[in-house]
Amino acid sequence: MPKKKSKKVKKNGKGVGGKADVHAHEEGKRNKSLLGHNAIFTPEVIDDIHIKSQLGRYRMRGMALMKKIPTFDDLVFLPGTLTRFVIEGYREKCETKTVIGPRCENPIELDIPVYITGMSFGALSYEAKTALARGATMAGSATCSGEGGMIPDERRYSEKWYYQCIQSRYGFNPHHAQLADGIEVFIGQGQKVGMGGHLMGQKVTDQVAEMRSLPSGIDQRSPARHPDWLGPDDLALKVEELRQLTKNKVPIQLKLGASKVYDDVRMAAKCDPDSIYLDGMEGSTGAGPHICLLYTSPSPRDATLSRMPSSA
């Protein structure tokens, strides 16, 4: 019987392992990629939709921003030449002292123009709050009580300390305000401008609840605006009320979440504060709607550079 011819497989032909097979494999990978991925409905977006459909509301989370934004690292310094007299860095000191509220009896003097913003005891912890107070004192800077009242040890370790007046009345103690080196009126924060505070129930311990005169173990919300003012005119009265409380001894600061910066700062200035604190979206928060944390308020850099009147 004649021998059967064996079928040869060409390595560079259409057989197994050939170029055509490799091409088909790559084409399949591309098709799979096109079918399995969408620039708008990414796997993360789809998961977010599923979670919100199960919750029946928007998602809440804390911590900082989870996307890249323009920062102050994108800016450069203009060195001195003829228009600004230069100093000899190895034998002359550079003065960084900043004075807040020079017209007050007891202005706040910072060795460096850096300030540890208000973060509540409920959002952080006793150890974190006291450590920040010690660090601010070592650096010649200041810290702030944050929402919800004063921790005695934080006040003791802080050489310069702000007491925060938030959008609600709970947690505010006029006797504690009189112990402060400055008063900060909280109007908004960068990561959730136009929204009130939200402390998750898991963080509302008995001690936190006692400080705020509220029940423990349940979510605590503060309103988006203070019940004592409905506009800039009422806010000016609140600033004057706090001046009378502190006998005009310490500076009053307004904290704004960055929005229409030019217009908001002009209206805030009419309330006659000693300083205006502008907070951008880079700052973190204890809890807030996930979508607001990502897509509201400009970055600190853009907020600082926003000097033109708004068109709206």
Residue ranges and their predicted role:
Residues G288-L294:
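C-terminal helical cap(s) of enzyme catalytic domains, especially alpha/beta-barrels
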